[in-house]
């Protein structure tokens, strides 16, 4: 079953209430569509990054890592085409003077018509049919004007044209300008990739949908350099491989789809792009992009060779040929992935209570590799004989995993607190533990319980948290 917009709202509220996500600068009224990640949120982010890095970089012998600067020489963005063509068409409402992306509103209109059984080409939707989402005025729009999405900054003591720089709108260009450095120092040759995780910035005119579209965001990108005749094959490979990554980490396959960009909507560098989309259930278009896998051809290395004067071709000694490699780029949004994992994991079911009845419980059925907290140690009560020994066990386990200790409140309520943040295992230290030197370990999803010797708890978790 696909998530609904009400579940998205519920998950957003849970994220804020449990400290996964806070509005940035909240005590000053907040910044629109800017978010800070709290104690649990930062753990979840780091776990997603760790799984991506392991799958894309360290588990392979044909990919290496890189961490490039956020502020690159301005010439990089001139050469890449971003200064000239990294634009979105904006229209302004003549009544309230709010600006919106024309293509987003056309797509939303077409999606609404589709729900009525009417097929409409978004590009053919006349702006006279579109109602302003801010003031409700219909069809009163200016002609579209291009709006460059790069954020400017100035280096140096005064703001001059010479000091003009940009905050990177993508991490990819830092990889391309280091292509020759990596080939030389890492002794790599095509097919090989360079992976990078880092922040990017885009002056989105209509950010929104919680953490889905923001001006500051993190990307997990990899540029895979190949011999040109093999590009199509490698493109298919990375589409399938990246789709499977989400499924392996617990996303319901029914909530994922592949969307191939029409030729007329491809980016200036692309010969073909396929998006991995998740069915968030947004109003208008329920699908949202998690990751794009593009065949960037040899555009990037060729243009940087031309503008820098540095040869970025590759000489294949075995075949005595020289070529400019094509690039296959899987580019994922970290916080979009985080949002999808949360929405897909959110579940409401029932659990037995101490009175013999059942209570509603909220569970995040996150893959244990992603769960912010791996285990919680819960003494049956706050007792002088129980809490110190339970704390000692938590301290021991904390050497290997992120482990919480909680002795406040009824044990059932403490279970619920851990369930709704996705903790896979709760370890109860009770009065019997003082005699049999064992604890009860409860599994999150099935709520099954197992008695395990205290000396074996670490091994018990190690088997079940492998890969975390």
From Swiss-Prot:
InterPro entries: aa-tRNA-synt_IIb, aa-tRNA-synth_II, aa-tRNA-synth_II/BPL/LPL, Anticodon-bd, Anticodon-bd_dom_sf, Gly-tRNA_synthase/POLG2, Gly_tRNA_ligase_bac, GlyRS-like_core. GO terms for molecular function: ATP binding; glycine-tRNA ligase activity; protein dimerization activity. It comes from the Bacteria. One of its GO terms (cellular component) is cytoplasm. Substrate binds at residues 101, 170, 217-221, 329-333. It holds the Pfam family HGTP_anticodon. Coiled coil: none annotated. It is found in: Cytoplasm. Keywords: Aminoacyl-tRNA synthetase, ATP-binding, Cytoplasm, Ligase, Nucleotide-binding, Protein biosynthesis. It is an enzyme of class 6 (ligase). The keyword Ligase applies. This is Glycine--tRNA ligase. The gene is glyQS.
């Amino acid at each position: 079953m696909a998530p609904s917009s009400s579940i998205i709202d519920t998950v957003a509220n849970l994220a804020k209430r449990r400290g996964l996500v806070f509005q940035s600068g909240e005590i000053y009224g907040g910044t629109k569509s800017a978010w800070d990640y709290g104690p649990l949120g930062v753990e979840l982010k780091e776990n997603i990054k760790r799984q991506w890095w392991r799958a894309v970089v360290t588990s392979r012998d044909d990919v290496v890592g890189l961490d490039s600067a956020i502020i690159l020489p301005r010439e990089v963005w001139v050469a890449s085409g971003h200064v000239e063509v990294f634009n979105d068409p904006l229209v302004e409402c003549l009544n309230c003077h709010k600006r919106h992306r024309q293509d987003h509103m056309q797509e939303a209109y077409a999606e609404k018509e589709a729900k009525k059984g009417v097929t409409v080409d978004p590009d053919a939707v006349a702006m006279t049919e579109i109602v302003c989402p801010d003031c409700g005025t219909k069809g009163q729009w200016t002609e579209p004007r291009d709006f460059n999405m790069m954020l400017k900054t100035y280096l140096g003591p005064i703001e001059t044209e010479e000091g003009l720089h940009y905050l990177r709108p993508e991490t990819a260009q830092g990889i391309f300008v280091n292509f020759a450095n990596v080939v030389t120092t890492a002794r790599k040759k095509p097919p090989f990739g360079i992976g990078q995780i880092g922040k990017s910035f885009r002056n989105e005119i209509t950010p929104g949908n919680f953490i889905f579209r923001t001006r500051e965001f993190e990307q997990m990108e990899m540029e895979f350099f190949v011999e040109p005749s093999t590009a199509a094959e490698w493109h298919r490979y990375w589409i399938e491989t990246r789709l499977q990554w989400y499924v392996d980490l617990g996303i319901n396959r029914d909530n994922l789809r592949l969307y191939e960009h029409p030729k007329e909507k491809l980016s200036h560098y692309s010969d073909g792009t396929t998006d991995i989309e998740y069915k968030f259930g947004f109003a208008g278009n329920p699908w949202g992009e998690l990751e794009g896998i593009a065949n960037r051809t040899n555009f990037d290395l060729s243009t940087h060779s031309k503008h820098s004067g540095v040869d970025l071709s590759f000489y294949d000694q075995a075949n005595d040929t020289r070529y400019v490699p094509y690039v296959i780029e899987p580019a994922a949004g970290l916080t979009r992935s985080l949002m999808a994992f949360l929405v897909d994991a959110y579940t409401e079911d029932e659990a037995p209570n101490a009175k013999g009845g059942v209570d509603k419980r909220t569970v995040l059925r996150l893959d244990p590799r992603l769960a912010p907290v791996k285990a919680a140690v819960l003494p049956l009560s706050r007792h002088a004989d129980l809490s110190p020994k339970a704390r000692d066990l938590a301290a021991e386990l904390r050497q290997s995993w992120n482990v919480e200790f909680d002795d406040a409140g009824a044990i059932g309520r403490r279970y619920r607190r851990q369930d709704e943040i996705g903790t896979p295992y709760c370890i109860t230290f009770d009065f019997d533990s003082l005699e049999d030197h064992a604890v009860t370990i409860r599994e999150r999803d099935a709520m099954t319980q197992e008695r395990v010797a205290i000396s074996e708890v670490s091994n018990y978790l190690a088997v079940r948290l492998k890969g975390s």
